Amino acid sequence: MAVNHVRSKSSNGKRLVQSKLNINNETILKCPKCEMKYSPNSIDDVATHKKYHDLHINGRNWSQTWGIPIHDTTSSTIIATPSSSPFKTGKSVNNKNNERIVMIQENKPAEVKAMLEIMDIVNQELNAPQDENNFWRKPNAEHQGKAIVYIKDKKVVGAITVEVLKQHKCRWMIYETRTLVEHVRPQFTLGISRIWVCRAQRGKGIAEKLLDAARISAIPGQNVDKMKLAWSQPSDSGGKLAKKYNGVKHKSGHILIPCYL
């Protein structure tokens, strides 16, 4: 098997490397952006890669009629809802980019199906199980958890799923070592099962907005403090986000992150 590398520059000047594998005279490419492997000689492979690439990089198309706009009850504000929205309550923000945050309605099959497609993407990137959606997708799951998405220019570019926690699952995690603190049982309210932002929109504060939206809307009538929000086995990037969002410095000098099993 031979391995060749095709080098090019991206629009931001970074050098990209596209790997080319020759297996039994069949060329297999690895996309330097979405990291999918495919055969450029296969029509099906090329089509599959095009769809996969667009979803991972730019997000998923989203109907303007899907989801319930999320309100900040402390300021009577609809979070990131465009001025053209039929929902006129409160003050809108981020109108110029046509951005909004909505909650998935578990009794709407089209919304649930679309969200499950997004979760496929999320779980592929995180190498996480694909069967952890029942707490937000079942019609009787009102008080078990919620799924929330961030929409920009009619595409879902970010998503979060949160679940109501049972106290025996709550722990503190030492950020530097990724180990749990023994014999301490803190009390947290919401667990972040998944959080994701498409690659083209990372570093723009979308993850933090999703976290805030989840805190104020996941439990009806309750605005959850950010220190009551726990993380589930965060990835490297997730750990950095957790440290920034609600990590606390212990007297030992270590950073502690609220997490759950």
Curated annotation (Swiss-Prot):
Keywords: Acyltransferase, Cell cycle, Metal-binding, Nucleus, Transferase, Zinc, Zinc-finger
Coiled coil: none
EC number, as in UniProt: 2.3.1.-
Subcellular location: Nucleus
GO biological process, one term: DNA replication
Keyword Nucleotidyltransferase annotated: no
GO cellular component, one term: chromatin
Top-level EC class as recorded in UniProt: transferase
A GO MF term: protein-lysine-acetyltransferase activity
Domain N-acetyltransferase, chain residue ranges per copy: 102-261
PANTHER family associated with the record: N-ACETYLTRANSFERASE ECO (PTHR45884:SF2)
Function: Probable acetyltransferase required for the establishment of sister chromatid cohesion and couple the processes of cohesion and DNA replication to ensure that only sister chromatids become paired together. In contrast to the structural cohesins, the deposition and establishment factors are required only during S phase. Acts by acetylating the cohesin complex component SMC3.
Family: Belongs to the acetyltransferase family. ECO subfamily.
Protein name (Swiss-Prot/TrEMBL): N-acetyltransferase ECO1
Native source species: Candida glabrata (strain ATCC 2001 / BCRC 20586 / JCM 3761 / NBRC 0622 / NRRL Y-65 / CBS 138)
Gene field: ECO1
